[in-house]
């Protein structure tokens, strides 16, 4: 997914951030009359493993470009039988199993902050995404808990069963 249908590319931007280099160059262009920026999280050619993705640099780069809303698309598995392959799920919660494995904050080195994260996703944006998916004819599910785990492997059957018992989707 390195070309977005309907995107008129204006420029490709290489940025440097306080957190290192982003995954690749940003593609900036117009989509349905809106200025958008796109970045392949794993780099062109899918060359970065999930652990190697420089998430903080990627996010900071979007901030440098003036991006106000960030939408991340992932190909994932489901813990629910009623979620079929190709369905779109717009979660409202996240269960992060990567803590301690990769940097989890923009703070540190003398910069201390405590950030509320009880509602990690913007609900108005999520509502707009849900409506857009439905209008496009997609089967979309609103709400649910996304389990973020360290890849590149997927969960074992035992891990999946535990996540299902916890009510994750």
PLM feature segments, named:
Residues 17, 50, 121, 151-152, ...:
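Residues that cap or flank secondary-structure elements
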């Amino acid at each position: 997914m390195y070309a977005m249908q309907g995107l008129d590319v204006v420029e490709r931007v290489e940025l440097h951030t306080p957190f290192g280099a982003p995954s690749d160059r940003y593609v900036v262009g117009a989509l349905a009359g809106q200025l958008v920026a796109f970045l392949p999280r794993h780099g062109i050619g899918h060359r970065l493993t999930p652990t190697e993705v420089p998430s903080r640099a990627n996010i900071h780069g979007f901030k440098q470009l003036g991006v106000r809303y960030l939408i991340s698309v992932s190909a994932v598995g489901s813990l629910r039988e009623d979620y079929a392959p190709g369905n779109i799920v717009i979660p409202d919660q996240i269960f992060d199993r990567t803590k301690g494995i990769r940097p989890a904050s923009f703070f540190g080195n003398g910069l201390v902050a405590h950030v509320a994260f009880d509602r990690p996703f913007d609900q108005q944006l999520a509502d707009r995404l849900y409506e857009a998916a439905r209008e496009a004819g997609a089967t979309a599910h609103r709400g649910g808990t996304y389990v973020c785990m360290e890849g590149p492997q997927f969960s074992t059957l035992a891990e999946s069963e535990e996540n299902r018992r916890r009510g994750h989707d």
